[in-house]
Amino acid sequence: MGFLVSKGNLLLLLCASIFPAFGHVETRAHAEERLLKKLFSGYNKWSRPVANISDVVLVRFGLSIAQLIDVDEKNQMMTTNVWVKQEWHDYKLRWDPQEYENVTSIRIPSELIWRPDIVLYNNADGDFAVTHLTKAHLFYDGRIKWMPPAIYKSSCSIDVTFFPFDQQNCKMKFGSWTYDKAKIDLVSMHSHVDQLDYWESGEWVIINAVGNYNSKKYECCTEIYPDITYSFIIRRLPLFYTINLIIPCLLISCLTVLVFYLPSECGEKITLCISVLLSLTVFLLLITEIIPSTSLVIPLIGEYLLFTMIFVTLSIIITVFVLNVHHRSPRTHTMPDWVRRVFLDIVPRLLFMKRPSTVKDNCKKLIESMHKLTNSPRLWSETDMEPNFTTSSSPSPQSNEPSPTSSFCAHLEEPAKPMCKSPSGQYSMLHPEPPQVTCSSPKPSCHPLSDTQTTSISKGRSLSVQQMYSPNKTEEGSIRCRSRSIQYCYLQEDSSQTNGHSSASPASQRCHLNEEQPQHKPHQCKCKCRKGEAAGTPTQGSKSHSNKGEHLVLMSPALKLAVEGVHYIADHLRAEDADFSVKEDWKYVAMVIDRIFLWMFIIVCLLGTVGLFLPPWLAGMI
């Protein structure tokens, strides 16, 4: 029984301790309920919260940015996530905290109270006003704080002059849509936009964001309407565009410059130009999706791309002209004197170009050696002389002069006399071609050359005279003349001092055959002589002096054709050398033009690059 009494006392004590707490909570809730009933009984949310109709409702306005979502250059629109801060006083919503259990503030639905109709004037898309109506914080003195979040798409005039190094000034204009300045006036909470909770953007950085109070009279109305305009100065982060836009443009420009450094002989200049032009065209198709499509101003990068396009097009035109100059020849074009003077003399010195002359000198040396070889007295080897000739010299008893009937083969016994011999056994004496006559000798004999003549042999031009002789031991009653010639190359000296008298003149020489044959076989053979008189006419010493400059020539027609062929080859090489020289001059002119435009395009490319970066740098955007 005592246990039950003690247990009942404990329950009474517990209830006594709990009931005051519940009574306090119930009293607090009852106080707010009573407060709400008191505040909103007969409250009209459509009327301005002023005691006198002439009073002005002061609305303190502020803005806090949470995120810069996007800046659309094409649509010229800025999307932001902001908190709209608003404060005003409502005299109808006041109370004494002592009457309501010291309740100093309550949260009330914003739909139940009067709100200023503040909207975004420069709204581009979506709702002008706040759509998410959060609860307002009401204080006992009638002060109301309302901070609803909002995502605004405000129109922004995008200036893409220095794109991608641009800096934009986007504005957000807030004001009452229906109440003029006499009804509602705005007061800025802070001079700057609150960025304490700002989430940094990956493309834009906010340089500054300030708010300015303005009053404006619109054409539609006679009243003055106040507004607070926030200016967001934002700058683009150019790293993405530098890597994906500017550097490729610079590389394309460099490729265009390299076109003029490429030799014309490789044949890839036009291919490189067309490849650069096609790559730039494809690149421009991608750029149009990035660059703002506005006609108000041309972006700087657009100007640079247009400059590069013109750059590449001009390089193609110039390359075609350079290739045309490079492949010119004497058969198609004649090089004017001013071109030779300007592009072969003046401009290369200004460009510090030095033309190599090794190939041209080698060609000249080759042709000179060919001419020297054809005129050389030792063109043929001495060992190739025919051994079938025999000599018999019989000087005339009437005179010291060589007899016209002396054997021509006598001088063949002297191996030191001939200076040039052909492999075919042909001899020639080099001199200008005077008229030739043919004479006959009743006795086959050869007149030997005098010592003065043989020692004065030197270089000369080779001509052909045919020598006839009879073979050894032919059949009886028949004499056969065969064409056999051995080349002697010599020049007649102006004077001969051998034995104190003049040598025999070439005009007095007679060409005869001397062969071993039977005495009873007379024969007669015709030969060619140089300005000879009739056969058997003796030559005079004075005649010899009068014909000093003439030379005796003995050459066969075949040898003459061979020598003429060599001269033809030499002349052909000389003509080819002249053509080659003119072609090389045209090629050098093309190279000089290439070098001129190489330096010009390098300078223009550097100036264009500087023009791309200098204006933004001067404007303080880089």
From Swiss-Prot:
Glycans are attached at residues 52, 102. Residues 326-595 are cytoplasmic. Pfam families: Neur_chan_LBD (PF02931), Neur_chan_memb (PF02932). Disulfide bonds join 156-170, 220-221. GO terms for biological process: acetylcholine receptor signaling pathway; membrane depolarization; monoatomic ion transmembrane transport; neuromuscular synaptic transmission; response to nicotine; synaptic transmission, cholinergic. Residues 390-407 have a biased composition (Low complexity). Residues 380-477, 497-516 are annotated as: Disordered. Residues 450-472, 497-508 have a biased composition (Polar residues). Residues 24-237 are extracellular. Residues 1-23 form the signal peptide. InterPro entries: Neur_chan_lig-bd, Neur_chan_lig-bd_sf, Neur_channel, Neuro-gated_channel_TM_sf, Neuro_actylchol_rec, Neurotrans-gated_channel_TM, Neurotransmitter_ion_chnl_CS, Nicotinic_acetylcholine_rcpt. Belongs to the ligand-gated ion channel (TC 1.A.9) family. Acetylcholine receptor (TC 1.A.9.1) subfamily. Alpha-4/CHRNA4 sub-subfamily. Neuronal AChR is composed of two different types of subunits: alpha and beta. CHRNA4 forms heteropentameric neuronal acetylcholine receptors with CHRNB2 and CHRNB4, as well as CHRNA5 and CHRNB3 as accesory subunits. Found in two major stoichiometric forms, LS (low agonist sensitivity): (CHRNA4)3:(CHRNB2)2 and HS (high agonist sensitivity): (CHRNA4)2:(CHRNB2)3, the two stoichiometric forms differ in their unitary conductance, calcium permeability, ACh sensitivity and potentiation by divalent cation. Cells produce predominantly an (CHRNA4)3:(CHRNB2)2 nAChR. PANTHER family: NEUROTRANSMITTER GATED ION CHANNEL (PTHR18945). This is Neuronal acetylcholine receptor subunit alpha-4. It comes from Gallus gallus.
